[in-house]
Amino acid sequence: MIDVRRRSWPLSWPGRLGRAVDPYVAALLGTVALAALLPASGAAATAVGDAADIAIGLLFFLYGSRLSTREALNGLRQWRLHLVVGASTFVLFPLLGLAARGLAPFLLTDRLYTGLLFLCVVPSTVQSSVALTSTARGNVPAAICAGTYSSLLGMIVTPLLAAWLIGSDVRFSANGLLAIATQLLLPFLAGQALRRWTAPFIGRHKKVLALLDRGSILLVVYTAFSRGMTEGIWNQITPARLVALLGLAAAVLGLALTTTSFTARRLGFRREDRVTIVFCGSNKSLATGLPMAAVLFGDAAGPVILPLMLFHQLQLMVCAIIAGRWSRRAPEAASAQGERVQITEVRG
């Protein structure tokens, strides 16, 4: 007889869906829905915007507190990895944005294409890249360094690339660079300076601070989408334009993922480093991009940040699925590597 109590029945569709959907992605989608139904307006919008600015500063303070000087210097030893990530972020993406110029007049408005170009020059993200790399069992220390280097470099490179590629729409000035440095670089340096005292606290409260990290991003997303609702950005875009924008964003993400994966494999990087390169080289930072857009575009930033907001949602959903698949394959890869080592030892 068959013991049905021990039989492993296949998951139902709701069960499969529950395992497939990352809780953070679900929270992001819920945040977008909340902003669509109950957008912050008036005094509430001002308060939420100020809270988002504080949250972004706190994020960079934590980045500075977490990254030790020794880790930063050791990270420089993996210069090939960081070079590939930097080339993807600040060379490949802008080229993809320029390649879409021929399609833009037929698919997008001028402001949406400006936003697509801006998306392509925004630096990589720290929090999401590290979380995805950790899930996929990649090189987490390298991901921390790569994301941090990209964010710091982007404070200078992003405004320069935006001014070069976009032109007169960008308000590029010394005051703008100072504003970006004040909101992003200053908290990071403060975190570095106070790391001696803050690092032990951070080490003891990793789970709570991880929730704070993600909560900060959710607050930034809510603020951005609320602004889009109150300013009528969504009403200015036809469904056809929105679908076209999603299609172009998906194409850019797909090409970035494919190119970074292919390049990392061809250059002979280890599996752990390939994971880091793919996620750090294909992700874009909403926490860094939003304040930069506010400085570089002023009151006209509304439609410009829409491609970045959509890309951010898309990258998290797609990369969460990829990270989950790679996580399940990691034991197989480790086993195969162990077998190769044993064979080499026997032959030796």
Where in this protein do the model-derived segments appear?
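Structural signature of multi-pass alpha-helical membrane transport proteins
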Residues: 2-104, 163, 167-271, 338-348
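Membrane-embedded alpha-helical segments of transport systems
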Residues: 26, 88-96, 121-126, 142-163, ...
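Juxtamembrane helix-boundary/capping and inter-helix hinge elements in multi-pass membrane proteins
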Residues: 69-70, 76-81, 105-109, 133-142, ...
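The feature identifies polytopic integral membrane transport proteins across all domains of life
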Residues: 79-87, 107-121, 138-148, 176, ...
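Generic hydrophobic alpha-helical scaffold/packing signal
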Residues: 226, 251, 264, 278, ...
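C-terminal transmembrane helix pair
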Residues: 286-338, 343-348
